[in-house]
Amino acid sequence: MAKSKGVRIIVTLECTECRTATAAEKRSPGVSRYTTTKNRRNNLERLELMKFCPQLNRMTLHREIK
């Protein structure tokens, strides 16, 4: 028997400020990304969380990407 897909899915969160920051503002090159899970039934819209960005060395808004 095949298993049905679960309710929880894995999503990737990306820093919104790393894309627009200049090289002088960043501590290291690149974009901060986190992976987490979300409940497909409860959260239909994209997830937004405040997370620590190691490139900017502060808390920034991270949004779900595809």
From Swiss-Prot:
Q: Which Gene Ontology terms cover its molecular function?
A: structural constituent of ribosome
Q: Which InterPro entries match?
A: Ribosomal_bL33 (IPR001705), Ribosomal_bL33_sf (IPR038584), Ribosomal_zn-bd (IPR011332)
Q: Does the keyword Ribosomal protein belong to this entry?
A: yes
- Which UniProt keywords are given for this protein, alphabetically ordered? Ribonucleoprotein, Ribosomal protein
Name by which UniProt lists this protein? Large ribosomal subunit protein bL33B
Instruction: Give the range the annotation lists for the signal sequence.
Output: none
Q: Which family does it belong to?
A: Belongs to the bacterial ribosomal protein bL33 family.
Does the record's keyword annotation contain Ribosomal protein?
Answer: yes
Q: Which GO terms describe its cellular component?
A: cytoplasm; ribonucleoprotein complex; ribosome
What would be one Pfam family of this protein? Ribosomal_L33
Q: Which BP terms does GO give this entry?
A: translation
